[in-house]
């Protein structure tokens, strides 16, 4: 299964996967407005490979059912919160 991957011009770390290069017909207009101008990153064969940040089976399922897959960036790390939690844990030990 081939798919084309595009990065968002408006939302850093956001990628859109579609089954056919430059065919955004299955992507809702509201999503395309929020996504901004798509910039083609690559076309890949999803068979027999893995992806760094997303489950490949979810990508395939979404491409088949919805006609696209939207990859959002991971939430930012809250280092201060992690530090506070470690300090609290150390006090309890």
Curated annotation (Swiss-Prot):
InterPro entries found in the cross-reference section: YcgL-like_sf, YcgL_dom
Pfam families: YcgL
Domain YcgL residue range list: 1-84
Residue ranges, annotated region (Disordered): 72-93
Residues in the signal sequence: none
PANTHER family given in the database record: PROTEIN YCGL
Protein name as catalogued: YcgL domain-containing protein VV1_0131
Native organism: Vibrio vulnificus (strain CMCP6)
């Amino acid at each position: 299964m081939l798919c084309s991957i595009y990065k968002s011009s408006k939302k850093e770390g956001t990628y859109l996967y579609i089954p056919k290069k430059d065919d955004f017909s299955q992507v809702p207009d509201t999503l395309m407005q929020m996504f901004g101008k798509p910039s083609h990153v690559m076309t890949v064969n999803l068979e027999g490979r893995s992806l760094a940040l997303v489950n490949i089976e979810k990508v395939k399922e979404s491409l088949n059912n919805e006609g696209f897959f939207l990859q959002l960036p991971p939430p930012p790390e809250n280092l201060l919160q992690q530090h506070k939690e470690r300090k609290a844990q150390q006090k309890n030990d």
